[in-house]
Swiss-Prot record:
It holds the Pfam family Bombesin. The gene is Grp. InterPro entries: Bombesin (IPR000874). This is Gastrin-releasing peptide. Residues 94-121 are annotated as: Disordered. GO terms for biological process: mast cell degranulation; negative regulation of voltage-gated potassium channel activity; negative regulation of voltage-gated sodium channel activity; neuropeptide signaling pathway; positive regulation of behavioral fear response; positive regulation of peptide hormone secretion; positive regulation of phospholipase C-activating G protein-coupled receptor signaling pathway; positive regulation of respiratory gaseous exchange. GO terms for molecular function: neuropeptide hormone activity. It comes from the Eukaryota. The modification Methionine amide is found at M52. PROSITE patterns: BOMBESIN (PS00257). Keywords: Amidation, Cell projection, Cleavage on pair of basic residues, Cytoplasmic vesicle, Mast cell degranulation, Secreted, Signal. Residues 94-112 have a biased composition (Low complexity). The lineage of its organism: Eukaryota, Metazoa, Chordata, Craniata, Vertebrata. It comes from Mus musculus (Mouse).
Length: 146
């Protein structure tokens, strides 16, 4: 046991005699800067990537006010387009609902009867001739059957 205590005591004395100071040597170079400044010429290494692309807030406040007004106007335009699209969808939906409903016809008892002798229903001459020929065929079949 005595040997292990002696080795611990010697280790403590050696450690106490070691120079105390920063982990990296702080020596000034020829330009007056420290060695760390030469290692990281752009400043503290943790903030270099973090602050890239950042701008000062007090550079030009008038530009930010102009941007804010432009953004408000752009937002108003988007709102107008959204309202117009919503109105269009409502109209399309209403038109779609109407197209799915059957057409409204008056009851059969109120509809006028068709007179085969009356040619007012046929404005086209060819259609009238076709109907006349069909009527003749039907009359012939009716005459032979009786």
């Amino acid at each position: 046991m005595r040997g292990s205590e002696l080795s611990l005591l010697l280790l403590a004395l050696v450690l106490c005699q070691a120079p105390r100071g920063p982990a990296a040597p702080v020596s000034t170079g020829a330009g007056g800067g420290t060695v760390l400044a030469k290692m990281y010429p752009r400043g503290s290494h943790w903030a270099v990537g973090h602050l890239m692309g950042k701008k000062s807030t007090d550079e030009s406040p008038s530009l930010y006010a102009a941007d804010r007004d432009g953004l408000k106007e752009q937002l108003r335009g988007y709102v107008r387009w959204e309202e117009a699209a919503r109105d269009l969808l409502d109209l399309l939906e209403a038109a779609g609902n109407q197209s799915h409903q059957p057409p409204q016809h008056p009851p059969l008892s109120l509809q006028p009867t068709w007179d085969p002798e009356d040619g007012s229903y046929f404005n086209d001459v060819q259609t009238a001739k076709l109907v006349d020929s069909l009527l003749q065929v039907l009359k012939e079949k009716g005459g032979t059957a009786s």
